[in-house]
């Protein structure tokens, strides 16, 4: 009789150990896969870098780098010209 009882208990031991392992997995629901996250981030960075290089090399972005640089006094000269032009215009008669 004791032999049968020991045999039945030995059959139950793996199920008890398996249920304990499952409980440990259930206790820790947040398991992060950092390797996949790192690879995904690197792929995303490479795609953005490639798109940036292709955009620069395709010259579809029409930037205004070809404009002549203005001299420091040009803006002041334009304002003075407008002031003198307004001063020399004949004043309109008010009705």
Curated annotation (Swiss-Prot):
The chain crosses the membrane at residues 36-58. Belongs to the FXYD family. One of its GO terms (cellular component) is postsynaptic membrane. Residues 19-35 are extracellular. It holds the Pfam family ATP1G1_PLM_MAT8. Residues 59-95 are cytoplasmic. It comes from Pongo abelii (Sumatran orangutan). Keywords: Cell membrane, Ion transport, Membrane, Potassium, Potassium transport, Signal, Sodium, Sodium transport, Sodium/potassium transport, Transmembrane, Transmembrane helix, Transport. GO terms for molecular function: sodium channel regulator activity. This is FXYD domain-containing ion transport regulator 6. The gene is FXYD6. Residues 1-18 form the signal peptide. It is found in: Cell membrane. Associates with and regulates the activity of the sodium/potassium-transporting ATPase (NKA) which catalyzes the hydrolysis of ATP coupled with the exchange of Na(+) and K(+) ions across the plasma membrane. Reduces the apparent affinity for intracellular Na(+) with no change in the apparent affinity for extracellular K(+). In addition to modulating NKA kinetics, may also function as a regulator of NKA localization to the plasma membrane. GO terms for biological process: potassium ion transport; regulation of monoatomic ion transport; sodium ion transport. Regulatory subunit of the sodium/potassium-transporting ATPase which is composed of a catalytic alpha subunit, a non-catalytic beta subunit and an additional regulatory subunit. The regulatory subunit, a member of the FXYD protein family, modulates the enzymatic activity in a tissue- and isoform-specific way by changing affinities of the Na+/K+-ATPase toward Na(+), K(+) or ATP. It comes from the Eukaryota. The keyword Transport applies. It is a single-pass type I membrane protein.
């Amino acid at each position: 009789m004791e032999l049968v009882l020991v045999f039945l208990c030995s059959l139950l031991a793996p199920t008890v150990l398996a249920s304990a392992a499952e409980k440990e997995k259930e206790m820790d629901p947040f398991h992060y896969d950092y390797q996949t996250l790192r690879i995904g981030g690197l792929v995303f960075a490479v795609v953005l870098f490639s798109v940036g290089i292709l955009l620069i090399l395709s010259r579809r972005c029409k930037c205004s780098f070809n404009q002549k640089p203005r001299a420091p006094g040009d803006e002041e000269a334009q304002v003075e010209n407008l002031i003198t032009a307004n001063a020399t215009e004949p004043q309109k008669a008010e009705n």
